[in-house]
Regions:
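Catalytic cores of transferase enzymes with a strong primary signal for eukaryotic protein kinases
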Residues: 32, 43-47, 59, 119-123, ...
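Short amphipathic alpha-helical/adjacent loop interface patches that line ligand
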Residues: 26-29, 143, 147
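Hydrophobic ligand-binding cavity/cleft-lining segments
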Residues: 1-51, 164
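Glycine-rich portal/gate segments that line the openings of hydrophobic small-molecule binding cavities
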Residues: 34, 44-97, 110, 145-164
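Hydrophobic beta-strand positions in extracellular immunoglobulin-like domains
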Residues: 14, 63, 115-117
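Beta-strand/loop substructures that line and gate deep hydrophobic ligand-binding cavities in soluble
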Residues: 89-145, 161-162
Length: 164
């Protein structure tokens, strides 16, 4: 594997949620800036598929991590099996494939995020051989923010439901 190639497998657990609830958010990337705001700064739809399947939907992303750099990339839905799997082909500042897999557990939802990417920003390519541990830490930070964002989101929903 080249120094600028990465494989990240991240597990999340969202307690008290159903697969359908989590799917509603993770399959709608335009919602990411509301619950994953520290990482997803902007998401816009570039193309909707004509057949309504979701395959071929193209979105433009502006993201960042804890480190002081931003990533601009396009994600195209390559495969989708509602409500348990969505696969995104990424291109731009990084290229590769990301797959979200959801499974219902007794007390919540397990989410596996599997990213296989090549980062093409000049400084990542130039300094990857010494910076890879820091880039991996940055990815873990971003993923932890996403898990926390979903947990907080569903916690708020429960509070609203309890008060109604």
């Amino acid at each position: 594997m080249a120094a600028n190639e990465y494989h990240f497998l991240t597990p999340w657990f969202i307690p008290g949620a159903t697969v359908e609830q989590v799917w509603a958010l993770v399959s709608d990337a335009t919602s990411f800036p509301t619950w994953w705001r520290s990482v997803f700064l902007e998401v816009s739809v570039e193309q909707e598929p004509e057949d309504g399947s979701g395959v071929g939907k193209r979105l433009r992303y502006h993201t960042k991590g804890y480190l002081p750099y931003h990533l601009y990339w396009t994600g195209t839905v390559a495969a989708i099996e509602p409500p348990t799997m969505i696969e995104i082909a990424a291109s731009g500042d990084f290229n590769g494939v990301g797959r979200w897999t959801l499974s219902q557990r007794e007390n919540g939802v397990y989410v596996a995020l599997d990213w296989r990417i090549t980062v093409d920003q000049w400084f990542v390519k130039k300094f990857a051989f010494i910076m890879n541990p820091l880039f991996a830490w940055n990815h873990r930070w971003a993923m932890a923010c996403g898990e926390e964002g979903l947990i907080v989101h569903f916690g708020r929903l429960k509070l609203k439901g309890a008060g109604a």
